[in-house]
Structures are given as C-alpha cells and as structure tokens.
C-alpha cells in the first residue's frame, strides 16, 4: 500500500465541510456500506442553510463527537463519527473517506488510529464498536488493523469492538 500523507481531525465548522458531507453522502460508492438514516442528507442541508458556521460543531456533536478527516492543507476528505450507544461507556464509530479517489492510501487507517487515541486517552471512552457489513472487506481489514476484534452479528452487520483494556 502507498503511504498516506499526514492527516488530522478537526470539528466540522465550515460551510464547505457541510457541502462536502452532503456531496459524499450522495455518492452511492461512498454510502454503499454505510448505515445512515435516509433523512441525513436533508438534515445536513437544513443545518447548512440555517445554522451559523460557529454553531455547526454544537449541532453535529449533540449525540456524540463528529470530526472531519483533513489533509495537511486543511482540505476535508472524509469524516469520523463517535455516536453514543445505550451503554454509557460505549460509542459506535462510523467512518468514511468521502473522496473515493483517495481510497487505498491509508487515510482511513490514520483517521481511525487518531480517533481511538482521542477517544481512549482524552475523552475517557472505554469501548468503541463498529458495525460493518460483512461484504465490506476493506473496512473489515481496517478494523482489524486498528485493533478491533469481531464481537457478534447484529442484523445484517458484524459488530467489531476495541476497548481501552485491549489497547
């Protein structure tokens, strides 16, 4: 695999970020394996149209934490979401490199590793799960490479988990 350029995570705080999210979520190649609500594009469009830029992170972080995956120059190329679950110590991670021309360069792995560090070391989260479609071999390999282990089947998804105890 080719080596990825450095990436960093930041809050979704710009109108351009919202435009990118909406664009990515309209791409069937990007969303083919995502488990997102059908109304998410409408919700994001409404936020982009009505919420001032400084308030975007507040709205996107109401149910967990939301980050843009950015190249060194600040260009957003994907996102990571840590969503609260019914278990207070567990969050679900959802991730996507929205720029499909950048798939296979290691950006996803770098983003997941940074997210795990942030979650475990800075936010005090104890466990993170990822629900992955079994057909999504790339995402399954990524989860294993980042320390997730197969936990159980939940509907049409396999659930993988990483915990502070296992890192």
Predicted features, each with a name:
Residues 53-56, 116:
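Terminal output helix/cap of sensory domains in signal transduction proteins
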């Amino acid at each position: 695999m080719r080596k990825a350029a450095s990436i960093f995570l930041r809050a979704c705080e710009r109108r351009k970020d919202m435009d990118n999210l909406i664009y990515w979520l309209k791409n069937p190649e990007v969303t083919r394996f995502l488990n997102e609500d059908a109304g998410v594009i409408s919700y994001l469009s409404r936020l982009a149209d009505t919420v001032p830029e400084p308030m975007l992170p507040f709205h996107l972080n109401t149910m967990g934490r939301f980050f843009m995956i950015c190249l060194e120059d600040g260009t957003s190329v994907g996102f990571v979401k840590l969503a609260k679950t019914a278990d207070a110590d567990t969050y679900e991670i959802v991730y996507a490199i929205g720029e499909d021309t950048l798939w296979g360069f290691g950006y996803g792995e770098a983003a997941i590793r940074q997210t795990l560090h942030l979650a475990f070391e800075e936010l005090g989260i104890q466990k993170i799960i990822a629900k992955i479609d079994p057909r999504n071999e790339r995402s399954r390999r990524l989860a294993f490479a980042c320390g997730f282990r197969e936990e159980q089947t939940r509907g049409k998804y396999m659930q993988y988990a990483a915990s502070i105890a296992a890192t």
